[in-house]
UniProtKB/Swiss-Prot annotation:
Plastid listed as a keyword: yes
Name this polypeptide is given: Ribulose bisphosphate carboxylase large chain
Keywords: Acetylation, Calvin cycle, Carbon dioxide fixation, Disulfide bond, Lyase, Magnesium, Metal-binding, Methylation, Monooxygenase, Oxidoreductase, Photorespiration, Photosynthesis, Plastid
Essential cofactor(s): Mg(2+)
Subunit comment: Heterohexadecamer of 8 large chains and 8 small chains; disulfide-linked. The disulfide link is formed within the large subunit homodimers.
Length: 481
């Protein structure tokens, strides 16, 4: 009889409740290369030892339940159970611990982020013995990574499709996000693309509302793309949001975008769901479409430091599920994002191999085994004065996306796009000539504005706009060197 089906008659069955740590806390366990490893921030209820709390997480997210069951004897728990193998105290926080859990790979369906998350971040997050629980990081083993398609195309293929190299890409979210007619929306797209942007974008909640149905928007945006391409000689795109109420409708919209010949579409991957997102990513690879991903709803999940899921985990999940771009914060704009933490998950999106680095919040070494990379998108409250910092922080393999920072230009949409393109080209040239963007950024922008009236006007409008608020999600004291 195989170990998987062996009946433990010699052990016998004893009903009742026993401590989780007797079965699921195994500090001597040596992790395997095929294990999925998780780092949980655990805040136990008063009186619950950290070992019991960590073991409870391992049990409730794998094979365990609240009482002993006789069917445990029909399988091999040692083969399938999750194990809490290490616990460390979080310095500077009262009664808070990092619990490390190892999961055997056989617990998870191949190629399914949905199944992986249903286990690891499922019912355990409502467990009464814990005051709070947060998933800080995951190590995805190479054996599991290879079961995913990942991004439809990846960074290098996108650059080849667009024929654009050596600089960040420029984008703009059309504003107001709701209320424009399809024709006026298309006009704004055309003006921004003609002015020098690479992309424009539907906002995350632009789907198919009474004021602008999706098919009309797609048609007017396609017209804007082709007209601006003819006038500028550059390849242009607009992120056509295919997110819909059903997967069937989502794919119908994606197919229509393909028929129009546009280069890129968009999906809200958290509100749309991982199953829908993975399906769309497969469609995009099969049909040559790039896929832009918006992270609407992420802050509900990731912003609180003691409960939820850290965005670095959501970013890893997106790379598995599939997307060529994803919003990743700005560090300098209006949205949450501490610099070292942001750079940590930006590397996890782009790079093929990332070493463990607790100073950037990275708990595990991650090998993506040639899974294509994802371009991080900096978006939210940014303008021309931020361009040097953004170019310095995110580097060439990124998308810098200015909504109000384009459409809020006093002379209109096209001049706003011109201002952003001039500022970017000036920063890239200065960097290539050896200047320090962090130190010389303002002088670079001022110098460029002398021969660009559009940039000069933008500099004047936004010279005093700042968002000086402390990040909620910060590094722990024991992570800061």
């Amino acid at each position: 009889m195989s170990p998987q089906t062996e009946t433990k008659t010699s052990v016998g069955f004893k009903a009742g409740v026993k401590d989780y740590k007797l079965t699921y806390y195994t500090p001597d366990y040596e992790t395997k290369a095929t294990d999925i490893l998780a780092a949980f921030r655990v805040t136990p209820q008063p009186g619950v030892p950290p070992e019991e709390a960590g073991a409870a997480v391992a049990a409730e997210s794998s094979t365990g339940t609240w009482t002993t069951v006789w069917t445990d004897g029909l399988t091999s728990l040692d083969r399938y159970k999750g194990r809490c193998y290490h616990i460390e105290r979080v310095f500077g926080e009262k009664d808070q611990y990092i619990a490390y859990v190892a999961y055997p790979l056989d617990l998870f369906e191949e190629g399914s982020v949905t199944n992986m998350f249903t286990s690891i971040v499922g019912n355990v997050f409502g467990f009464k013995a814990l005051r709070a629980l947060r998933l800080e990081d995951l190590r995805i083993p190479a054996a599991y990574t290879k079961t995913f398609q990942g991004p439809p195309h990846g960074i290098q293929v996108e650059r080849d499709k667009l024929n654009k190299y050596g600089r960040p890409l420029l984008g703009c979210t059309i504003k107001p996000k709701l209320g424009l007619s399809a024709k006026n929306y298309g006009r704004a797209v055309y003006e921004c693309l003609r002015g020098g942007l690479d992309f424009t974008k539907d906002d995350e909640n632009v789907n198919s509302q009474p004021f602008m149905r999706w098919r009309d928007r797609f048609l007017f945006c396609a017209e804007a793309i082709y007209k601006s391409q003819a006038e500028t000689g550059e390849i242009k795109g607009h992120y056509l949001n295919a997110t819909a109420g059903t997967c069937e409708e989502m794919l119908r919209r994606a197919y229509f975008a393909k028929e129009l010949g546009v280069p890129i579409i968009m999906h809200d991957y958290l509100t749309g769901g991982f199953t829908a997102n993975t399906s769309l990513a497969h469609f995009c690879r099969e049909n040559g479409l790039l896929l832009h991903i918006h992270r609407a709803m992420h802050a509900v999940i990731d912003r609180q430091k003691n409960h939820g899921i850290h965005f670095r985990v959501l970013a890893k999940a997106l790379r598995l599920s599939g997307g060529d771009h994803i919003h990743a914060g700005t560090v300098v704009g209006k949205l949450e994002g501490e610099r070292e933490i942001t750079l940590g998950f930006v590397d996890l999106l782009r790079d093929n191999f990332v070493e463990k680095d607790r100073s950037r919040g990275i708990y595990f070494t991650q090998d993506w085994v040639s899974l294509p990379g994802v371009l991080p998108v900096a978006s939210g409250g940014i303008h021309v004065w931020h361009m040097p910092a953004l170019t310095d922080i995110f580097g060439d393999d990124s998308v810098l996306q200015f909504g109000g920072g384009t459409l809020g230009h006093p002379w209109g949409n096209a001049p706003g796009a011109v201002a952003n393109r001039v500022a970017l080209e000036a920063c890239v040239q200065a960097r290539n000539e050896g200047l320090d963007l962090a130190q010389d950024g303002n002088s670079i922008i001022r110098q460029a504005s002398k021969w660009s009236p559009e940039l000069a006007a933008a500099c004047e409008v936004w010279k005093e706009i700042q968002f000086n608020f402390k990040s909620v999600d910060t590094l722990d004291l024991n992570e800061i060197k």
